[in-house]
């Protein structure tokens, strides 16, 4: 992509999700979005590493993806019970992302990475055959 072309994220082409925001975030949730999310977000402007395990600070042997995690309860449950798996959670709804960040912080999980826009873009970015089948 050239520097003059807008990124697909800014264009929003092909997006298939609903609203991005709900009620006003609490101070805690707004702080988590500002301070914690940048360290967990996947940067699709950079090429995906051939081994996605390199994106996690802990050793992971499997890669799983959860699209549309809502408030994150299921994603956190799975991440707690499968600490050898790296999880990519996708949720464009800011309020859901904030709820997940609170859970990740409370449970001190290191095997989760996040994306806050169109899941199709993340799926296109992932290397072929990188997601572990269940």
List PLM regions with ranges:
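S-adenosyl-L-methionine
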Residues: 1-65, 73-82
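S-adenosyl-L-methionine-dependent methyltransferase catalytic core, i.e., the SAM/SAH-binding region
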Residues: 8, 109, 132-133
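SAM cofactor-binding core of SAM-dependent methyltransferases
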Residues: 62-124
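A short acidic, Gly/Pro-enriched loop at the edge of an enzyme's catalytic core
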Residues: 124-134
């Amino acid at each position: 992509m050239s520097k003059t072309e807008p990124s697909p994220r800014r264009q929003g082409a092909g997006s298939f999700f609903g609203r991005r925001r709900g009620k006003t975030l609490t101070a805690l949730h707004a702080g988590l979005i500002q301070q914690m999310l940048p360290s967990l977000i996947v940067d699709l402007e950079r090429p995906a590493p051939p081994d996605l395990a390199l994106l996690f600070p802990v050793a992971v042997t499997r890669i799983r993806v959860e699209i549309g995690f809502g408030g994150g309860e299921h994603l956190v449950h799975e991440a707690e019970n499968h600490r050898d798996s790296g999880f990519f959670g996708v949720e464009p709804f800011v309020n859901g992302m904030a709820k997940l960040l609170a859970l990740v912080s409370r449970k001190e999980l290191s095997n989760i990475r996040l994306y806050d826009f169109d899941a199709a873009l993340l799926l296109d970015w992932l290397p072929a055959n990188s997601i572990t089948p269940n």
